[in-house]
């Protein structure tokens, strides 16, 4: 999150905050990135400047004022659609119009909204070398089993990992699914501010998307190896506005690199009087990594699950083998979990029951 420190840039940032940003969300049938005559425009898609959230009108159009603490505009990717790593735009000086093309992506979403997704975390790679095997295994499984999306909850990690990982695993490489990334403590690296490189490669550190009857929210870890520019207040104020457009019929699942501060009532906010009551909003689960273990716990007071997943690349410190977690979400947002081991090549064994 780029918060301008140099006095010489304050003027342009002020103008950015005062700008009116407009655009449309549309189904890009020919995938040329342009809104062509006859292409469908999508109604009621949330669009945000990092603070304010609006929804597109019947013509697929939106208008936002801009926010000085966020250099992006981004959409809540609607269910049944995907973008090729482009659910966001970095705001450019002098440009005020940003159209968002989306493509149909119904694979893995059943008629009742139920679906499956894959959770990975803490891959902590140093480069592409030595990682293609587990990535291919993950991608092949996703394609064969019609997985709705893959989510990585951070620690990609350090400069070398951040630069390499996006080339190994991204939405453009997969035909009928998509991948979303979150930021971990080891993804806050040296630069003008901790999340600078992550933003350059992966986009905003908080955002949301819809799949079936579930609203998914990615949130950033609040501390790390280097100081981030974003604050909990930034995340809270955006999340509050984001959830204002989520109907009561939808369940909510939150992603983060670690556990929330409040694992009793799951209230996310600034104080005892200013917070979001996530269970009251429909929170079903909080998925995270960080601890390099596999752990599932249902909290008695709220019924919310906290689900930790280790790395698919080399196993966990709990001696768990390399694996990725497959989660099934039913029409009411209830979650079931299973594991699939990494590095397993396809094989067929023919046996005789008589011998």
At which residue positions do the language-model features occur?
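A short C-terminal boundary segment appended to hydrolase-like catalytic domains
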Residues: 328-355
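Extended active-site neighborhood of metal-dependent phosphoesterases/phosphodiesterases
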Residues: 78-83, 90, 103, 163-246, ...
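A short, solvent-exposed beta-strand micro-motif common in secreted/extracellular proteins
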Residues: 52-53, 68-82
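Short, acidic Ser/Thr/Gly-rich low-complexity loop/linker segments typical of extracellular
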Residues: 29, 35, 41, 48-61, ...
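A short, amphipathic beta-strand motif
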Residues: 21-27
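Short acidic, glycine-rich surface-loop motifs adjacent to enzyme active sites
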Residues: 246-264
């Amino acid at each position: 999150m780029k918060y301008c420190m140099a006095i010489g840039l304050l003027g342009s940032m002020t103008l950015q905050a005062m700008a009116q940003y407009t655009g449309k969300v549309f189904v890009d049938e020919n995938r040329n990135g342009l809104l062509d005559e006859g292409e469908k425009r999508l109604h009621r898609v949330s669009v945000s400047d990092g603070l304010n959230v609006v929804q597109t009108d019947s013509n697929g159009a939106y208008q936002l004022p801009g926010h000085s603490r966020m250099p992006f505009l981004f959409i809540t990717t609607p269910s049944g659609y995907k973008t090729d790593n482009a659910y966001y735009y970095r705001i450019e000086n002098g440009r005020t119009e940003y159209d968002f093309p989306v493509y149909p992506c119904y694979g893995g979403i059943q008629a009742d909204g139920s679906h499956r997704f894959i959770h990975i975390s803490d891959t902590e790679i140093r480069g592409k070398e030595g990682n293609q095997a587990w990535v291919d295994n993950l991608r092949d499984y996703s394609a064969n089993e019609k997985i709705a999306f893959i989510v990585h909850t951070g620690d990609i990690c350090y400069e070398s990992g951040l630069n390499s990982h996006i080339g190994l695993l991204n939405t453009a490489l997969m035909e009928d699914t998509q991948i979303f990334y979150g930021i971990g403590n080891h993804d806050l690296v040296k630069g003008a501010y901790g999340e600078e490189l992550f933003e350059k490669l992966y986009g905003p550190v908080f955002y949301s998307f819809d799949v079936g009857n579930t609203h998914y929210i990615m949130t950033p870890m609040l501390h790390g190896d280097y100081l981030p520019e974003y604050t909990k207040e930034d995340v809270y104020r955006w999340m509050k506005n984001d959830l204002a457009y989520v109907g009561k019929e939808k369940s909510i699942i939150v992603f983060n690199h670690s556990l929330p501060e409040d694992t009793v009532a799951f209230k996310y906010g600034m104080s005892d009087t200013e917070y979001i009551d996530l269970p009251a909003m429909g929170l079903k689960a909080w998925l995270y990594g960080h601890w390099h273990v596999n752990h599932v716990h249902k909290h008695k007071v709220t019924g919310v699950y906290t689900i930790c997943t280790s790395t698919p690349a080399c196993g966990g410190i709990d001696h768990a083998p390399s694996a990725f977690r497959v989660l099934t979400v039913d029409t009411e947002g209830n979650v079931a979990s299973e594991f699939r081991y990494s590095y397993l090549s396809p094989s067929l064994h023919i046996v005789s029951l008589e011998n």
